[in-house]
Amino acid sequence: MKKTDPPITAAQTYRTTLSDLWSAITNAERMRKWYFNTIHDFEAREGFEVVFDVECEGENFPHRWKVTEAVFEKLLKYTWKFDGYDGAATATFRLDKEGEAVSLAVSFQTTEDFTAPLPQFQREACQGGWKYFIEESLKSYLESN
């Protein structure tokens, strides 16, 4: 993925409340149920940083996130890097109330080129991952609780 690429986006509307959606994307215990089961801690606070490992197809990817902006129940933004690999991105989550439901729009913008010739760093893999997380996994998690 290159910084000249347009952002990867995913969006979904959920039958839940803003507070429930905010909690699902900012509470580590809840994030483990739909997002990354190895994330051990998370705080929606500017400057908070977490590193956790994710294994994919026998390869270990140490995820490093740093929160750069958090507006309660409205906006969450963090940098996303993989320790040991070139490249960086910013993940932005925008929440909004839509009648009796709430919407989430996610944007993943590459800010430094991912240069490793791995399938996990291809745009299609990233698009598929965000589609799965936002449109399937989070939706199922929120609407079954």
Residue ranges of model-derived segments:
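ATP/adenylate-binding site constellation spanning eukaryotic-like Ser/Thr protein kinases
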Residues: 36, 47, 72, 135
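Short, charged low-complexity linear motifs
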Residues: 7-8, 19-20, 63-66, 106-118
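Hydrophobic ligand-binding cavity/cleft-lining segments
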Residues: 1-41, 45
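Hydrophobic-ligand binding "helix-grip"
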Residues: 41, 56-103, 109-112
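A conserved amphipathic terminal alpha-helix motif
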Residues: 110-145
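Hydrophobic pocket/interface hotspot
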Residues: 21-22, 31, 50-52, 67, ...
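Juxtamembrane/interface motifs at transmembrane-helix termini
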Residues: 41-44, 52-54, 123-126
